[in-house]
């Protein structure tokens, strides 16, 4: 018997159970605009070009993924306290933090960057500990006001574009993508006209296998898999195709004569492809292998699509669509705990 009650997805009283996460998701665009409201043109000297870029804090790997394909200098996402031993006055350190400031690692990295004489871009509230630690004559300050690490990352990337380190990123456009997903995923749209609710229904009795067809799509897949695990308390795997194929190939055969009311539902894998429109021969080959294996082993395939806008626009679209799906999955499963 399925634990998922799809009638809850269109029940206005039941929807109050996930009011907090839905409101948080709906406010993503507003938070991005808020954190980008006070952006200033960086003044690090004419023709400034760092030897390398070190990124620390939440969403550092997202910023690295955006920079790596086109940045003319090496880029490192540093997950520890302090900084790499080679960091010095010729380098740029980017520190990301939310409105609650940052953890001790980010504060340590900020202070170390100043001590070594590196240029610093810090995205943090003006009165936070990390902003104070990063204070120097060569610090570019982005005064953020929300708790959303994504907003800090978007603001920082727009500054990095001004320095010629990445393609154009317009925070307003990114925010608009988040707003568009919020509109189409609104709880006031019923299941027949709501892709996020439809995704939740597809994953009702499933073990999601999330795969992205590009670096950023794969990152969105990992973020969504994390949310699905929290929402359902079930396994959800985001991995490269070589790691997903054995799971698909080992899926138990589907029994069309099984009684759905006879015992608990058996979780079967569902392949969820996050497609941001980036195409490469290697990515196309991996996709074809995954889909072929899924068809052979009677594994359902779902697609989350974003094929319009810049790289960060598409990433945010994929991420938001998946996170809305996770929220509705949590709602559909909430009956088992009531």
Task: Locate predicted features.
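Phosphate-moiety recognition in structured ligand-binding domains
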Residues: 1-40, 68, 118-126, 130-138, ...
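A generic structural motif
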Residues: 75-82, 123-125, 144, 234-246, ...
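Active-site phosphate/pyrophosphate-binding segments
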Residues: 12, 17-20, 24, 30-45, ...
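Short, charged N-terminal beta->alpha structural module
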Residues: 18-22, 50-71, 216-229, 284-289
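Short helix-loop-beta junction
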Residues: 64-76, 226-237, 293-298
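Glycine-rich phosphate-binding loops that contact phosphosugars or nucleotide phosphates
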Residues: 47-182
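Glycine-rich, anion-gripping cofactor-binding loops and their flanking helix/strand elements
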Residues: 85, 93-108, 248-281
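Structural motif
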Residues: 55-59, 96-99, 123-125, 211-215, ...
């Amino acid at each position: 018997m399925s634990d998922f009650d799809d009638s809850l997805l269109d029940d206005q009283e039941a929807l109050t159970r996930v009011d907090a996460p839905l409101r948080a998701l709906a406010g993503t665009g507003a938070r991005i605009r808020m954190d980008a409201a006070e952006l200033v043109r960086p003044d690090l000297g004419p023709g400034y070009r760092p030897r390398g870029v070190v990124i620390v804090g939440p969403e550092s790997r997202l910023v690295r993924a955006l920079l790596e394909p086109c940045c003319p200098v090496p880029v490192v996402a540093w997950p520890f306290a302090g900084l790499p031993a080679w960091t010095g006055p010729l380098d740029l350190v980017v520190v990301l933090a939310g409105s609650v400031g940052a953890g001790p690692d980010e504060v340590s990295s900020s202070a170390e960057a100043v001590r070594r004489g590196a240029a610093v871009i810090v995205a943090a509230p003006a009165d936070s500990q990390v902003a104070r630690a990063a204070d120097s004559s060569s610090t570019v300050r982005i005064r953020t006001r929300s708790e959303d690490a994504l907003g800090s990352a978007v603001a920082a990337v727009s500054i990095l574009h001004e320095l010629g380190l990445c393609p154009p990123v317009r925070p307003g456009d990114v925010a608009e993508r988040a707003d568009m997903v919020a509109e189409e995923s609104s709880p006031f749209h019923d299941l027949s006209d709501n892709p996020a609710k439809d995704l939740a229904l597809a994953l009702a009795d499933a073990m999601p296998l999330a795969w992205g067809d590009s670096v950023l799509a794969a990152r969105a897949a990992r973020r969504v898999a994390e949310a699905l695990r929290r929402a359902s308390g079930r396994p959800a795997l985001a991995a490269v195709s070589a790691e997903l194929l054995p799971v698909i190939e080992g899926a138990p055969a589907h029994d069309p004569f099984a009684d759905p009311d006879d015992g608990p539902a058996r979780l079967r894998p569902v392949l969820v492809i996050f497609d941001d429109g980036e195409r490469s021969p290697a990515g196309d080959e991996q996709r074809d292998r995954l889909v072929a294996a899924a068809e052979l082993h009677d594994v359902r395939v779902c697609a989350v699509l974003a094929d319009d806008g810049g790289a960060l626009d598409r990433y945010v679209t994929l991420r938001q669509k998946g996170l809305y799906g996770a929220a509705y999955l949590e709602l559909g499963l909430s009956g088992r705990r009531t």
